[in-house]
Amino acid sequence: MDFLEKVLDNQVSESKELVKLYDYDLYTLGEAADRMRQNMHQKIVYFNVNRHLNPSNICADACKFCAFSAHRKNPNPYEMSLEEILEKVKNSYNKGIKEVHIVSAHNPNYSYEWYLKVFETIKQEMPNLHLKAMTAAEVHFLSTKFNKPFELVLEDMLKAGVDSMPGGGAEIFDEEIRRKICNGKVGSSRWLEIHAYWHKLGKMSNATMLFGHIENKIHRIDHMLRIKKIQSPKNQVENKEGGFNAFIPLLYQKENNYLKVEKSPSAIEILKTIAISRILLNNIPHIKAYWATLGLNLALVAQEFGANDLDGTIEIESIQSAAGAKSRHGLEKEDLVFKIKDAGFVAVERDSLYNFIQKF
C-alpha cells in the first residue's frame, strides 16, 4: 500500500512520518484532498457576511510577528469605548452582517467587567447577530490578569452572550518556536485546554495555524495532530456537539514586524499545506482558505486543494492588513459570489455554524 493511501486509511500517526506528505507532488496531494473535500461538501464554497472588529491595538504582549500592536513600527495606539464599538457594530448590522468577529490586543486598560458589558450590550441590542469573540490567548490574558480560572472566564463569556470563539492565538504549537515568536503568550497546552473546555460547554470554535515564518514542516504537522486529538469524535461533520468547526492555516504576513523573515512560502508549498490539513484533519468538517492572508485568487485556487471556505466579506480587518495583507476594506457579497461561481464552484452564504442561508 502506498504511503499516502496508508495516511488516508488512518494507519500513520507520527509527525516524523506524516511530514513525508510534503514530498508528494502538488497534483497528487491536491487530488487526494479534493476527493475528500468533494465527498464532504461537493463543489460548495462557503462564505458569510461578517465584520471584523479590533477594539484596541494596545497590547501587554510583544509578539515578534505582530504588526498590529502599538510599538515602534506602529506608533499609533488606540482603544475604542463601548459606545464606539456599539456604533460600529450597529452600522454594520444595519447593512446586513450576520456575524461580528471581535478580537483585540491584550489591552491592560480594559477591566474584566468591560469585556462582559461589551458582549451583553451587543446581544441585548442585536440578539440575532452571531457574536464570535475572544481568542484563547485573550481568555488566558484575562484569566492571569484578573486571577480567575480560565473555566470561569469562558462561563462568563457564555452568559454574556458570546456564541462562538475564533481560532486565533494558536500560532504554532511547538514551544521552542513560541518562545522565539510570542514569548509570554498563552502556551500551546493551555490554548488547547481552553478550546476543549469551550467545547465541553457545548459551543463551537475554530482553530488556526500561523505558518510561513521560522517554523518547519514537521512543526506544522505536529500542530495539526494536536488539533485533531482534542476534536470530539462525535463532531465529525454535523457539529451537533461542541467542537472545532473549521481549521484555518494562516499565512504569515512579513511586513512591519520584528521577526525578520525574508521569504514567504511558494504558492505550491501553501497549497500543499492546505491539502495536507484536509487529509489529516478528517474529523474537522471545514478547511478555510482565508482570503485576507492568501489573497482572493490563491484562496479560490485552494478550493481545489481541500479547502471549502473563504471566510467572509470581513468589511474591516486591521490585524493582518497591518502586516501587509490586502484585506483592509473587505469585499462586497456580490463580488464574492461572482468570483466563486466564476471559478467553477457553487457559492453558499452560510451562518457562523455552517447552516445554509442562500445558495447561488
Name these PLM-found stretches.
Residues 1-27, 87, 93, 224-228, ...:
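Auxiliary Fe-S-binding modules of radical SAM enzymes
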Residues 10, 33, 63, 102, ...:
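Conserved, mostly hydrophobic/aromatic
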Residues 18-21, 51-53, 104-108, 211-214, ...:
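Conserved short loop/turn motifs at secondary-structure junctions
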Residues 30-72, 77-103, 165:
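N-terminal pre-triad scaffold of radical SAM enzymes
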Residues 41-50, 55, 59-60, 64-73, ...:
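Mobile, glycine- and charge-enriched loop segments
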Residues 45-51, 100, 131-135, 165-167, ...:
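Hydrophobic faces of well-ordered beta-strands that scaffold small-molecule active sites
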Residues 49-52, 73-76, 103-113, 175, ...:
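Glycine-rich, proline-tolerant flexible connector loops at the mouths of alpha/beta enzymes
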Residues 72-229:
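Conserved Radical SAM active-site core
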